UniProtKB/Swiss-Prot annotation:
Organism: Verminephrobacter eiseniae (strain EF01-2)
Family named by the database record: Belongs to the FGGY kinase family.
Name of this protein: Glycerol kinase
Function noted in UniProt: Key enzyme in the regulation of glycerol uptake and metabolism. Catalyzes the phosphorylation of glycerol to yield sn-glycerol 3-phosphate.
Keywords (A to Z) from UniProt: ATP-binding, Glycerol metabolism, Kinase, Nucleotide-binding, Transferase
Gene name as annotated: glpK
Length: 511
């Protein structure tokens, strides 16, 4: 049997999973990762703790699997995106805590860029909106606020990377300073048409090019792990940002296929194929995981400009499963997150109650930072069960709004709306939520047999570059649905419910 090791470095934990060649989980290990909150709106990680926890889980997963490192064909890395690390090339020590993707400290600099009229040019090159979410503005802040950082960067003494780059650096004992196109595309510094760092964007944010890692396709040779770390050197063969990795792990390889990850928030991606398309409906365009060129197509897989182009439309919901956490921890309405399904199931519907969980504003496709959470439609007959059901349904409403926006963009480009939605993430195990999602969308919702699709995507990318697999067609044959939720609701009723939702959104933003 041949094995693959996936490192899944997330915001709240570091995990490692050993997969067999059929994409089945053999063993896994996980450690929580603490977040640091220096002041309101600021979120940081200790980069050394990211590294220590990830290495520890990799060793633990191999031990649980009962295999030696030389039985592993390749390592794949999936990581939280946008989180920014800056370190000293000589010592390998970070010069500051990592600035996490949720961190908003760079918003004033982003507002200045918008006021200066750069939004159109940046979106045309990167597919992104100007926002503190993305790495470029975080890196600019570090260079401007860490004493001596800008001068050291200009002397070539520092290295920048998203979490994947940091892990590759540590895994190879500083021999490789690399990233992949899907992570690079989240920096607001990569021209996604050329897969190269854009000199104009670097100059605009005053970022020395010497800081930047080399960009490779997502399935490529990222070097070998140092032999002393895992007991044997293993090729790092696949790297992707977590959401693009999940899209790959869901076997969404062709235009029009889509997945939604139901976690603390929700992340929906629709594959665009090789066609770059900006959204007219509040969505982002980003690079999907990209493969090395086919034989004869170029000079080698280390040339990102020659990668097989693949793009995705993306929308993010700020509050998904977090609304259940709020019911548990904030209202103490339930004792465990798992208890919400039984409570919601105790009533046939939400009884006209509508919840808009805009605790931190509304993300795509609305982009209403001023929105605040609301519960409407309450009557004397409303119960805690109705509120619980409305909270659960709010996740589906927000996701439906995303998919409808994607459908409008797809049709405008001459394509067709999404015909099925593949789902993953912790909340996808909730049958009531998945059925209501299918009812709202009017298309099947498919839950895979392996819901750890983020790690699986990284493993598949590593397997392709190491010739364990030979094509995405082969991977598509491995994908299996554990359950298929067919829509049961009359379409007129579904449209009526969505109209009620949009009315509730307008109320939540009427400030």
């Amino acid at each position: 049997m041949t094995y693959l090791l996936a490192l899944d470095q997330g915001t709240s934990s570091s995990r490692s999973i050993v997969f067999d060649e059929h994409g089945r989980i053999v063993a896994q290990a996980q450690l929580e990762l603490p977040q640091i909150y220096p002041r309101p709106g600021w979120v940081e990680h200790d980069p050394l703790e990211i590294w220590r926890s990830q290495l520890a889980t990799a060793r633990a997963a191999l031990a649980k699997a009962g295999i030696a490192a030389n039985a592993v064909r390749a390592v794949g890395i999936a990581n939280q995106r946008e989180t920014t690390v800056l370190w000293n090339r000589k010592t390998g020590q970070p010069v500051h805590h990592a600035i996490v993707w949720q961190d908003r400290r760079a918003e004033p600099a982003c507002a200045q860029l918008r006021e200066q009229g750069h939004a159109g040019a940046i979106q045309a090159k990167t597919g992104l909106l100007i926002d503190a979410y993305f790495s470029g503005s975080k890196l600019q802040w570090l260079l401007d606020h860490v004493p001596g950082a800008r001068e050291a960067a200009e002397r070539g003494e520092l290295a920048f990377g998203t979490v994947d780059s940091w892990l590759i650096w540590k895994l190879t004992h500083g021999q490789r300073h690399l990233t992949d196109v899907s992570n690079a595309a989240r920096t607001m510094l990569l021209n996604v048409h050329t897969n190269q760092w854009d000199d104009d964007l670097l100059a605009l944010l005053r970022i020395p090019r010497a800081l930047m890692p080399e960009v490779l396709p997502s399935s490529a040779d990222f070097g070998d792990t140092a032999a002393d770390l895992l007991g044997h050197g293993i090729r790092i063969g696949g790297v992707a940002g977590d959401q693009q990795s999940a899209l790959f792990g869901q076997a969404c390889f062709t235009a029009g296929m889509a997945k939604n990850t139901y976690g603390t928030g929700c992340f929906m991606l629709m594959h665009l194929g090789a066609r770059f398309q900006t959204s007219d409906n509040g969505l982002l365009t980003t690079s999907a995981a990209q493969l090395a060129p086919k034989p004869g197509a170029g000079s080698g897989q280390a040339e990102p400009a020659l990668a097989q182009r693949a793009y995705a439309m993306e929308g993010s919901v700020f509050i998904g499963g977090a609304v259940v956490q709020w019911l548990r921890d904030g209202l103490r309405a339930i004792t465990s997150s798992a208890g919400i399904e039984a409570l919601a199931h105790s009533v046939p519907d939400a009884g006209g109650v509508m919840m808009v969980p805009a605790f931190t504003g509304l993300g795509a496709p609305y982009w209403k930072p001023e929105a605040r959470g609301s519960i409407t439609g309450l009557t004397r007959g409303s119960t805690l069960a109705h509120i619980a059901r409305a909270a659960l349904e709010s996740i589906a409403y927000q996701s439906a709004a995303l998919l409808q926006a994607m459908g409008r963009d797809a049709v405008a480009a001459g394509g067709a709306p999404v015909s099925e939605l593949r789902v993953d993430g912790g909340a996808c195990i909730n049958d009531l939520l998945m059925q209501f999602q299918a009812d709202l969308l009017g298309i099947p919702v498919l839950r895979p047999a392996v819901i750890e699709t983020t790690a699986l995507g990284a493993a598949y990318l590593a397997g392709l570059s190491s010739d364990l697999y030979h094509s995405t067609d082969e991977l598509a044959q491995l994908w299996r649905a554990e359950r298929r939720f067919e829509p049961r609701l009359d379409r007129a009723r579904a449209q009526e419910l969505m109209a009620h939702w949009e009315h509730a959104v307008r109320q939540a933003t009427a400030r």
